[in-house]
Amino acid sequence: MKKYILVLSICFAIASQNAEAQNKEKKENKEGKVSAIDHAKAQFDYAFEEFAKVKASGAKGVSPRTTKGDTLVLVASKDWTSGFFSGNLWYMYELTKDKKWLEKAKEFSAPIEQEKTNGVTHDMGFKIYCSFGNGYRLTKDPKYRDIMIQSARTLITRFNPTVGCIRSWDHHAEVWDFPVIIDNMMNLELLFWAFKETKDSTFYKVAVSHANTTMKNHFRPDFSSYHVIGYDPKTGQVTKRNTHQGFSDESSWARGQAWGLYSYTMCYRETGDKKYLQQAEKIGNYILNHPSMPKDLVPYWDYNAPKIPNEPRDVSAATITASALYELSTMVPEKAVLYKETADKIMKSLNKTYKAEPLTNKGFLLIHSTGNLPAKSEIDVPIVYADYYYLEALLRKRKLNK
């Protein structure tokens, strides 16, 4: 009888916690009377209208990326951001179960298929995993599986075993012989997936080598990250350390820190190697305890930008961080509450202050992201990948609450 009462008590406690969490989610996701999901539905419907207008004017891009003035900017499939918009639509299908989003996700994914054999870029994960990866996860369409496997095979052709990394850029040859950027860590998820699907250990070995080499060379003692490490492709030696999109080479570019947190959390999930978990936690500690981090946890574009607080924010860095923290909360029981509540606080800030007004900003969900400030590109604008990791964070939050 005592065991029976104990079981009932535990069940009641869990049910109460779940109900409280779900009510909290509804409350936090509301801005006025519109929930985060309803806001996204309306914005994406508006985005489809704006996309059609731009296409009718002769634009040749396949996917929305950002805005420039009052113009919706589209990109070709080869652009590193081309997979995010269809990824957003796959997430909308997952969040709503409405087949309308399924059909739209298929429509916007299709033009990106040709990238599966594009070997002159490292951005295969961003383009293919965010689009067809989510599509395969949700539909198990064998065609999507084939596209992803081919994409993974294409990606590893850029691996240099002497360096131990996948080459990032082919441009700026006058600056770097073999550049590797922190963003490239995000593409490893495609390789881990390909290993599990094919049992070909080459994918796994390349991913682990890249993760280990990056962990060795990209991070400073305080676990902030350089953006670009230049290698000698013949010897594997480091030749340059730069922060190309940050304030200075020794500064901490906010999105780069977020990529590091997210990717090493993912590497621990895929390998079980605790050194990756420790790395993720240390990067997270650097981010969350940095003296330049604002109270709302939406960082400035660079933690060392000289005119803080009069510097642009980068909402994309915040959404990547929130999504990573939700996952990290499932891996560290003693810090689960801390990580989840911190992610919740970021999402609450985004919903309260950084959400686009309905039927504005060409249908993007969030405002105030910064792409590449040193190049005077995409400053204080909506950017598609900020929306992507925001929706992913909403999904992860929902799953945790349930």
What are these regions (language model features)?
Residues 1-31:
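Bacterial Sec-dependent N-terminal signal peptides
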